[in-house]
Amino acid sequence: MEIDFSPENFTNQDYALRLVDWMDLEAQAIKRKFHKGLAVFAICALLCFIPLLFTGPSFAWENGPLEIAQNVVLFFETCLFLYFYKNAKGSRYQRLWGSVAILFLILLGRELSWGRVFFFKEMAPYGPAFYSLKEISYGFLVNWVVEALMLLTLFGLFRYAPWRAIWKEIPKPWILMALVVIRAVLSSLGDKEKILHTVFDQTIEEYAELLMYILIGFGAYWYYCWIRWMENRK
């Protein structure tokens, strides 16, 4: 909805009232788009699970289709928040978006086993095996780099996130949070083969993990939209 805020069109009181109306409309639009996106995600997640019933164990192996999909999602989310960081010049929250980008980068590094997946060793009964970090030339640096990135991320989140607004003003995405917890539980149970007690549990684990990463990205984008809305309101 476009509103002409030219001073000659109405008084200061009218301006304030219409600005409030416009911000309320924008807030409603954020909620609508988010809930619509979440509904589309749920339908697609269910439809995509059906073909997985006919796949073999190799589909969930390291460097398999599900693992690659996880890496693509995390890479996209990292790039998305780097883009937000770049375009937030002059904003007090610019470094917050940079911290979120680093968080997704850490998750991506974890899924890539810190680069181990690029050093194939042999094919084992459970799938491809890779050299350990101790056997890779840069392995001794990994822990130091990861810890530094984690500290940088935690500092950025605690220092630059508007925690008061997050707790008191910004709506909580309760449905999304519940879905993330459910996916995390399924991933953990699947890893221990405690769902169906078959090798298909590995596929459930990897698929649940993929959905969890997508939902975390949804959540990060939810707060990005609301913090931007909060900035515009002020």
Predicted regions and their residues:
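Alpha-helical transmembrane segments
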Residues: 33-49, 178-183
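Juxtamembrane "helix-exit" motif on the non-cytosolic side of transmembrane helices
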Residues: 49-59, 160-162, 188-198
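Short aromatic-rich membrane-water interface segments that cap or initiate transmembrane helices
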Residues: 61-68, 127-144, 202-210
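Membrane-proximal helix-loop-helix units in multi-pass membrane proteins
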Residues: 110-167
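Hydrophobic alpha-helical membrane-insertion segments
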Residues: 98-112, 175-182
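Membrane-interface helix-boundary motifs at transmembrane edges
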Residues: 83-96, 160-172
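C-terminal transmembrane-bundle signature of multipass membrane proteins
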Residues: 182-195, 204-234
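Hydrophobic cores of alpha-helical transmembrane segments in multi-pass inner/ER membrane proteins
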Residues: 70-83, 142-156, 209-227
